[in-house]
Amino acid sequence: LIECDTLPTTSLVSPAVFEEAYEKAVSAGETVIVVTISSKLSGTCQSARIAAEDYEGKVFVVDSLNATIGEQILVEYGLQLKKQGMTAEEIVSVLQEQKHKIHTMGLLDTLEYLKKGGRISPTVAFIGGALAIKPVVAVVDGEIIMLGKARGSKNGSNFLIREIEKADGVDFSKPFCLGYTGLSDELLQKYIHDSEHLWKDYAKELPVSTLGATIGTHVGPGAVAVAFFEH
């Protein structure tokens, strides 16, 4: 992204791509659970549902109402339930209920890519850059909202920590994850050091993932995110 003059574009997955995958799995005797990015952020969920119409009882689509690592931990939870011996229908029922307990929050390092994507004006981006403004965002009811803004990375990190503390506590019996964008996890490691008290006995072995191209395109490098189930 840093080396690109133009911002890459993102697009949804077509029904035909889903149908090809469904047919292959069902023909092999498998039952399929599809967990998608929030339907409020992408048309991919609708594509998955359209393709599933001919596979009733064999393909189940779950709208995660989330994205990136928030979507990831819902999938990981589904795999936990499968190992416990639940049927596909039972897993889907639990995921539909538990997805509302996921908190996904992030700290952005720059406003530049929100400007390039047309989500904020060049003037706002310029002023924010001059003042070292760091936005803190979250996925709420399937949409990305601004929780607040902080001046400087340290204040931004503290803001994110306070927002996590406001939640009902991390349920460590379920999957959780920290993530970052860019080629370096330096900012994430600083955040982990500052927020070590939040992760209790897991601080030295935290699951970490990159946030992926779709979200990374919109937020730019240097973003830090957390996703967890509340108690």
Model-assigned labels for residue ranges:
Residues 4, 30, 40, 44-60, ...:
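Mixed-charge interfacial surface used for oligomerization/domain docking
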Residues 12-16, 174:
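Short coil/turn segments at secondary-structure boundaries
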